Amino acid sequence: MGEAAVAEGPCPLLEDSFTRFSSQSNVYGLAGGADGRGELLAATLKGKVLGFRYQDLRQKIRPVAKELQFNYIPVDAEIVSIDTFNKSPPKRGLVVGITFIKDSGDKGSPFLNIYCDYEPGSEYNLDSIAESCLNLELQFTPFQLCHAEVQVGDQLETVFLLSGNDPAIHLYKENEGLHQFEEQPVENLFPELTNLTSSVLWLDVHNLPGSSQRLSALGCQSGYVRVAHVDQKNQEILQTWTIQQDGPISRVIVFSLSASEATQDSPQQEGYSLLVASMLEPAVVYWDLLNKGLDDQLLLPGSDQFDSVLCGLVTDVDLDGQLEVLVATYGQELLCYKYRGLPEDSRGFRLLWRRSFASPLLAMAHVDLTGDGLRELAVISLKGVHILQHSLIQASELVLTRLRHQVEQRKHQQGLGDRVGPRPVEHPAS
């Protein structure tokens, strides 16, 4: 066990609501909702899927949880994982994937259901989508179901990626002509996701903005971690880094702390790092992958003090424009870390705050559920979904402070322009 870390301050988020589950969920049980709207889908082990959102009731914004009736999920089924994505333009529509194991007596039967409605006007209607199902029987036990956008010919395509105990990653791509999804060899589009010797517990595919390249990271049950730098145009693996850690890997996340935006002419090549959460070790960040590989390891102090780290998230949770690293544990603690780069000899992550819950934490999402421009932090625990919000008083003060700063900046710029004044008009010589 590492040394105990002391938080710099209290958690700035307040719990706005809690919705109890009828049965527990798991680390793969949370997904986003339709068409970028503020909605979450949470799956429970006993075959139930809840749609969670806020809506205007009697002139007040209130949380609403509704059970969605997805077809072809037997009452005795145990849901393993759920994922959603919006089709890549110019295609339209929301796609929902659910894996489950049906109780078939001595041996459970695993399935993948893919839901998608092709009727114009219903492409984003969850109730309609839930009735339009493709049912695929699996020959392996499923784990994480996720999605990735990939270049196919001259257009972008979003596909499902499903890890299994075979051990392999399976790819499911839409056949537009048949209006259904089909399994295709993963090596055709993701050559870096082959030759696995242990089940992948978490996969993260991160397309690098402004380029045709991506970083793919996977963490396995054996503790094996692999990161690959890939050029999508010619399916070339440019570089691969691997490391062996102790214990199963619960989460890998590729992220960039760089504030600069990449463009097509100036792709961002630096600043990509990797969060790795292990069930037996402290969570770590491997800093600056493209330049240092997995050589520069930064510890998240105290992350091993509260049992296993089960999930992580990299997002700007304190509204300062810089990303923080959140990790949530089986020991019922949510920990928030901030990178401090100076002084150079003590650079690393500091524990900003921690927050305790009443049951183990499984999954997280940072989404704008209320539609007010401020994102809420949704935390899935064994017992239900907690929605954490910023204090509206503090948020409004922050907005006013930044508006005043903008006004002062503009006044200063106008003042400089007035002092310089217009250039004198030159009269031609007579």
Curated annotation (Swiss-Prot):
InterPro entries: Integrin_alpha_N, Kptn. GO terms for molecular function: actin filament binding. It comes from the Eukaryota. It is found in: Lysosome membrane; Cell projection, Lamellipodium; Cell projection, Stereocilium. One of its GO terms (biological process) is cellular response to amino acid starvation. GO terms for cellular component: actin cytoskeleton; KICSTOR complex; lamellipodium; lysosomal membrane; stereocilium. Part of the KICSTOR complex composed of KPTN, ITFG2, KICS2 and SZT2. SZT2 probably serves as a link between the other three proteins in the KICSTOR complex and mediates the direct interaction with the GATOR1 complex. May associate with F-actin filaments. PANTHER family: KICSTOR COMPLEX PROTEIN KAPTIN. As part of the KICSTOR complex functions in the amino acid-sensing branch of the TORC1 signaling pathway. Recruits, in an amino acid-independent manner, the GATOR1 complex to the lysosomal membranes and allows its interaction with GATOR2 and the RAG GTPases. Functions upstream of the RAG GTPases and is required to negatively regulate mTORC1 signaling in absence of amino acids. In absence of the KICSTOR complex mTORC1 is constitutively localized to the lysosome and activated. The KICSTOR complex is also probably involved in the regulation of mTORC1 by glucose. This is KICSTOR complex protein kaptin. It comes from Mus musculus (Mouse). The gene is Kptn.
